[in-house]
Every structure is written in structure tokens, then in C-alpha cells.
């Protein structure tokens, strides 16, 4: 993934998390970045409080679906569009009525036989 694409995804997910948490009595956003050497991946987790009734979970990644006024937000649709280009990157979304979690998993590319140097 190109750095500008990662930056765009990070910005969208953080903006959404902050915006959702601001509407809650308990305002909480947690960001975690870690490396999983066993599965050879980097993981970005963004978790926030949210108001359950404002989120259309079934359609949230579709173009034109937004919690913003007049459905002006394109953020998650744009995230989805970027992610479709990278089979080694997954976004897992979960919610429990109090916390909304986005977990971005970026797996290392495995070099093909042609790329492996021969001594």
C-alpha cells in the first residue's frame, strides 16, 4: 500500500472515530499499532464509543451512505475503494453497542520465486 493511501485511510478512520465519540457521554478513542511477527502483519486498531442508533452497519461502506447531514460523507466508501486494490490488507469492523472497532491488518507481501535471490 502506498503511504498516501495508508495516510488517507488512517485519517478517515480517526476522523470518524473522533466524530462519533464526541456525540457520546463517555468520549473515548483508542488507537493501537502493533506488529504481529507470527502472522507477519502490522495491525492498526481504532476503537471508539458511539451512539448505536446513528450507524447503518449494513450499508456503511457504500457510496452515498453517511451519518453526516445530507449523506455528504464518502470516507468509508473511499477506504473500501483503496482496500480493494490490496489483497494483503483487511479491514475488520465490529461493534457491541458501546464500542465501535476498526482493525486494519496489513500482511507482508511474500516474494515470488522470481524475486528470491539465488546465491
Spans of features found by a protein language model:
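C-terminal beta-strand of the catalytic ATP-binding
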Residues: 48, 104-110, 117
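Glycine-rich ATP-binding loops of the HATPase_c
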Residues: 87-96
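Glycine-rich nucleotide-binding loop
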Residues: 73, 96-103
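Conserved glycine-/histidine-rich ATP-lid loop and adjacent helix of the Bergerat-fold HATPase_c
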Residues: 78-88
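Conserved ATP-binding N-box helix of the HATPase_c
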Residues: 3-26, 85
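Short beta-strand/loop element within the Bergerat-fold HATPase_c
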Residues: 28-40
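Glycine-centered, small-residue-biased loops immediately flanking beta-strands
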Residues: 27-29, 88-89
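Glycine-rich/acidic phosphate-handling loop/turn and adjacent ATP-lid/helix
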Residues: 40-73, 115-118
Amino acid at each position: 500500500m502506498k503511504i498516501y493511501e495508508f495516510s488517507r485511510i488512517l485519517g478517515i478512520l480517526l476522523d470518524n472515530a473522533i466524530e462519533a465519540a464526541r456525540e457520546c457521554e463517555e468520549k473515548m478513542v483508542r488507537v493501537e499499532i502493533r506488529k504481529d511477527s507470527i502472522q507477519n502483519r502490522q495491525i492498526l486498531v481504532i476503537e471508539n464509543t458511539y451512539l448505536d442508533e446513528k450507524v447503518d452497519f449494513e450499508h456503511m461502506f457504500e457510496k452515498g451512505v453517511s451519518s453526516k447531514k445530507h449523506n455528504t460523507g464518502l470516507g468509508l466508501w473511499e477506504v473500501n475503494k483503496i482496500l480493494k486494490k490490496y489483497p494483503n490488507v483487511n479491514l475488520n469492523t465490529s461493534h457491541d453497542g458501546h464500542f465501535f472497532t476498526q482493525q486494519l491488518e496489513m500482511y507482508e507481501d511474500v516474494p515470488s520465486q522470481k524475486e528470491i535471490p539465488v546465491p
